[in-house]
Amino acid sequence: MDSNHQSNYKLSKTEKKLLRKQIKARHTLLRHEGIETVSYATQSLIVANGGLGNQVSRNQLLPVLEKCGLVDALLMPPNKPYSCVRYKTVEESKTAYDTLNGKEIVDDLGQKIILYLNFVEKAQWKELGLQALPPGLKVIEEIISSEDEKMLLESVNWTEDTENQNFQKSLKHRRVKHFGYEFHYENNNVDKDKPLPGGLPDICESILEKWLKEGFIKHKPDQLTINQYEPGHGIPAHIDTHSAFEDEIISLSLGSEIVMDFKHPDGMTVPVMLPCRSLLVMTGESRYLWTHGITPRKFDTVQASKGHKSGIITSDVEDLTLNKRGIRTSFTFRKVRQTPCNCSYPLVCDSQMKETPASFPESDKEALQLEQDYVHRVYEEIARHFSSTRHTPWPHIVEFLKALPSGSLVADIGCGNGKYLGINNELYMIGCDHSQNLVDICRERQYQAFVCDALAVPIRSGSCDACISIAVIHHFATAERRVAALQELVRLLRPGGKALIYVWAMEQEYNKKKSKYLRENRTSQGMKEEISNDASVQELLVKQLPNVGNQDSAHSVSSINDFQDGGCNSKNVANSKLPIHTNRTSFHSQDLLVPWHFKGNPGKDKRVEPFGPLGSRDPGPVFHRYYHVFCEGELEAACRTLNNISILQSYYDQGNWCVILQKV
């Protein structure tokens, strides 16, 4: 809607709303992408809400655009909620602008979305150079016939008697069967002393012999895991344990194609299309050094020109579209290793890594490493699943934000998926988090967020009217670092500014009332015992934890000691390993590792607790996060070590200690 048109007559209510949406789209593009729109007509238009990130495919959008003229190019960057169309003439572009602005279409999920268009001079995206498959990786297409595929799928009896040791284990939107040895997802390993009876299915034996004879594989596997995935399910990025299996790991895709992501430790990610009836073979560097995983989603970004052919998904924005996932069944074969691994990648090899006892960090460097391994890396892995469980804002936090004056600048330090950034539209809110994947989710929701360390926030001192820190400070591994995080919050505040802080409480039963975390105990007693007494998990964590000292960091700042006279009923854990907490039970130590059970299809996992993870009966991957849970009075004591604040209020809220402080 141009300015000349606006000046001729008074805008209707609908036109005003459309104009507001257009302006918002312009600001979002400029803030997040650096794309400037213009007020005059050009050949190019940015189509807000018409992107792959909105589940709008090329095949769906292009016919709509072509009704207005000859489309010269349609650029659809991956994971972005917009696209750019270039018409042959300016007149055709103007026609599209007038016709399609505010047009409602239905995306590939059946949801209604509205398109908003703005003119641009040019739109550019960074193009990644041509990528190669990770070394040692190959994909063999059509390795079996459609008849063999049908026989393999029909051979899997998902309803057999549970007395058979090969019976399936049902996960949410996923079923699993094991042959040869049971694959343990909590440590990506097998128990070599407990082979399953019967070996591999007969139908697989003949196929494997054929692959060996034709040179597709080098070893005959003795372990098979069959997974059936519903659309929307994923696999967290991982490396199969070095000491458990030989160099070669192979996976046969049946029923549907999928895009699998391979990631190098330097951060480079290579998405690879695995067609139906193709065999993925991982050897060497691709098996030992690169992680592999599948992002949980219902649509994959693929190249329109390649269809379902194998290969790398490039960043050619003129050739990207969406491909709807189907039900995929994977047959993953491995050869169990009987000797320690002596690969060329000792830094990620459990056979070659130095075993060190787990204790508590006595230096800032060791604390930083603990946080890196058991906070930051974990949140990057579980970000999508974690986000799906964080959807309901807490009333007292909402109350705090609603009470702030209109126009206040508020920083959410450790914003996660941004669920508090849109609570009060009269505030100017910005968020930050250490996790790139969580910040990406914020941006997908059109929130302003950036990546940073909570101990060094790149915001000018004294510029914020308020700050919130929800479930962040309990992840710092020493008292000094927790106090430093509080000091950083105060630094951001103007004089008179307020901060709201939430941390997980040691006391999950308070005033004779259990917290939601305890009340909503969905784990069986058997599962509790499995988690808390699993020696193999404890041993694995001992191997991975940094070499740390024996100081109990909860007492390393003397002024925080005063609050504890008879108050905190925790065990003395100095000179001990970090204990693994049993989910949905009371805490017995202030410093501990809390399991997070990764589940499938994050969009449908409804949970109500704010900070604590949920136990699971599913044998899915388990991640462990470091926590320091706070005793009553400890948070206030830490705040009082700061010399420029006053505590306005402190309270207990569903298993969390909370403070509102003001900068003086």
Curated annotation (Swiss-Prot):
Keyword flag S-adenosyl-L-methionine: yes
Entry's EC annotation: 2.1.1.229
Subunit structure: Interacts with TRMT112.
Cited function: Catalyzes the methylation of 5-carboxymethyl uridine to 5-methylcarboxymethyl uridine at the wobble position of the anticodon loop in tRNA via its methyltransferase domain. Catalyzes the last step in the formation of 5-methylcarboxymethyl uridine at the wobble position of the anticodon loop in target tRNA. Has a preference for tRNA(Arg) and tRNA(Glu), and does not bind tRNA(Lys).
UniProt cofactor(s): Fe(2+)
Residue stretches in coiled coil: none
Location(s), subcellular: Cytoplasm; Nucleus
Positions contributing to 2-oxoglutarate binding: N227, Q228, Y229, R328, R334
MF annotations from Gene Ontology: 2-oxoglutarate-dependent dioxygenase activity; iron ion binding; S-adenosylmethionine-dependent methyltransferase activity; tRNA (5-carboxymethyluridine(34)-5-O)-methyltransferase activity; tRNA (uridine) methyltransferase activity; tRNA binding; zinc ion binding
GO terms classed as biological process: DNA damage response; tRNA methylation; tRNA wobble uridine modification
Span of domain Fe2OG dioxygenase: 220-337
Cofactor stoichiometry and binding remark: Binds 1 Fe(2+) ion per subunit.
UniProt: Fe cation binding residues: H238, D240, H292
Residues noted as binding Zn(2+) in the record, renumbered to the chain: H242, C341, C343, C349
UniProt source species: Bos taurus (Bovine)
Family membership noted in the UniProt record: Belongs to the alkB family.
A cellular component term, taken from the record's GO annotations: cytosol
Domain of life: Eukaryota
Protein name per UniProt: tRNA (carboxymethyluridine(34)-5-O)-methyltransferase ALKBH8
Catalytic activity annotation: 5-(carboxymethyl)uridine(34) in tRNA + S-adenosyl-L-methionine = 5-(2-methoxy-2-oxoethyl)uridine(34) in tRNA + S-adenosyl-L-homocysteine
Alphabetized UniProt keyword annotations: Cytoplasm, Iron, Metal-binding, Methyltransferase, Multifunctional enzyme, Nucleus, RNA-binding, S-adenosyl-L-methionine, Transferase, Zinc
Residues covered by the RRM domain: 43-120
Chain residue ranges for the region called Methyltransferase domain: 411-664
